[in-house]
Amino acid sequence: IEEKLKKAGFYYRVAYRVKAPDSMLDKLILKDYRRPGTENQDKKMQDLIGIRIILYYADDVEIVKNFLDTIFSMPGVWNTTEANEYEFRAMKINGIFKLPGYLSKTIVNPELGDYVDDTFEIQVRTNSFEGWHEIEHDMRYKGSAFGTGNEALARKMNSILATLELCDDSVVGLIEDLGHQHYKDRKWNYMLRCHYRLKFTREPLHPYIEEI
């Protein structure tokens, strides 16, 4: 994945993990996978392996999501949060992909085959939202720090999302403005870097372009 992202020129970081046995057991119990009569009775755990792609530019999120669908044998099954005008919510962009056969045989314990799927999860988010998600995951999803009696603080936690979204938009807008300034100054090399927001090599442009 990193090789493909690097070759395409994205600004990104990648984090990954494989669930530890105790973490895997906790989730199997919490989600009631395969337990008759529950909403997950026909489901398996799909994120034994988790990969997170952290992007520096917000408008790369959708591009990378579509890009990932092209580099594996099958497109991902995506779970995304739709934005609306009335509220700010954590934007979930998570994809489930099939593990290659040679990996699933070495990673997934056959004795857990009824409970753990031969898949992995990829999460895509921006650098601005990364820290918020980490705190929210530990305090709210894994614990109950924002439980009953802390509704006002939970709302305040969610309101931070609006600021982070503005920060993401501001960074993209600033680089676009910088590119426009370089265009007016006829600095084509810098203009192209700002316009596409990709990692180019340090080689100079073709002399024909430089002389325009």
Locate each region found by the language model.
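Surface-exposed, low-hydrophobicity interaction/linker segments
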Residues: I1-R35
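Short, flexible, solvent-exposed loop/turn segments with mixed acidic/basic and small polar residues
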Residues: E39-Q46, E111
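Helix N-cap motif at beta-to-alpha junctions
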Residues: Y56-D60
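Short helix/loop capping segments that flank catalytic or ligand/cofactor-binding pockets
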Residues: E62-V64, S104-T106, E130-H133
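Short amphipathic alpha-helices in soluble, non-transmembrane regions
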Residues: V64-I71, P110
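A common structural junction motif
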Residues: D69-G76, G143
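Short Gly/Thr-rich strand-loop-strand
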Residues: V77-L99, L103-L112
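An acidic, glycine-/histidine-flanked metal-binding catalytic module
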Residues: V116-I212
